[in-house]
Amino acid sequence: MSLVTPHDALRRARDHHRGLAAFNVVQLEHAEAYATAAEATGRTVVLQISQNAVRYHGALAPLARAVVEVAQASTAPLVLHLDHADDRALVREALSLGFTSVMFDASALPYDENVASTAEVAAEAHALGVAVEAELGEVGGKDGVHAPGVRTDPAEATEFVAATGVDSLAVAVGSSHAMTERTADLDLERIAALRAALTVPLVLHGSSGVPDSTLTAAVRAGMTKINIATHLNHALTDAVRAYLADHPGVVDPRKYLGAGREAVTDEVMRLLTVIDAV
């Protein structure tokens, strides 16, 4: 089916204290695994391509077009989202390629500049019917240091959403990007306070470092969109290593990447249950 915008899924998830799953795509096997899991469970899944993935491939279009083809061949409702972009030219390219959601991350800028830049991006995207996510506060780990960043203030977040018109907000509540161990301790009280203060869905970045039970609790407290990348890369890599250990003579990447893709599919299906995904 065609790509969908996240608006309906975000609204349903927020209204019923359920999650919307968002998983990062680095290579085609990721997208195929996510689509397979979405079809098997009937859930909506957000397929995310990050600015870092674009740097790895050297361009956005080849991977984006491949993901669009996967989505159009799928029977599941899939969202194509640009993740953590601070490059406005990249955001515009994503809009031209048919992305149905974009994240513009100006959180490193002073507050007033963050507001102004984000509002401009939101206006441009909304004119095309595309959803916009932004970030306020500082989620740890962007620089490789797994320390929690500056927590998001509910009052400032309310002001920010009103001033920018964004559709969802990534908030800093104790998680950290790129964690390989699931030891993050989330501030559930702050999540609840942000949920009560804001009219837009909350987004949790750095969810790979959060234990299952805490992810479930975070969704119940008011977190909506749950971003997971590193944890699924871990699943893929572990499966590839295990396959090659058992089949040391194999050199065909379809063999070992197929094992990795299957492992990611299985883990995604499990995670969809953990967050009670819509």
Locate the predicted segments by residue.
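Basic/polar N-terminal segments that are highly enriched at the extreme N-terminus
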Residues: 1-4
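Generic enzyme active-site microenvironment
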Residues: 22, 81, 133-135, 203, ...
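Glycine-rich beta-strand-to-loop/alpha-helix junction loops that act as flexible
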Residues: 174, 205-208, 228
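Alpha/beta enzyme core
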Residues: 6-16, 28-53, 60-75, 85-197, ...
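Glycine-rich beta-to-alpha transition loops that act as phosphate-gripper elements at the mouths
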Residues: 24-25, 80-86, 200-212
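Short secondary-structure transition/capping motifs
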Residues: 23, 52-56, 79-80, 260
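C-terminal alpha-helical cap/extension of soluble enzyme domains
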Residues: 211-278
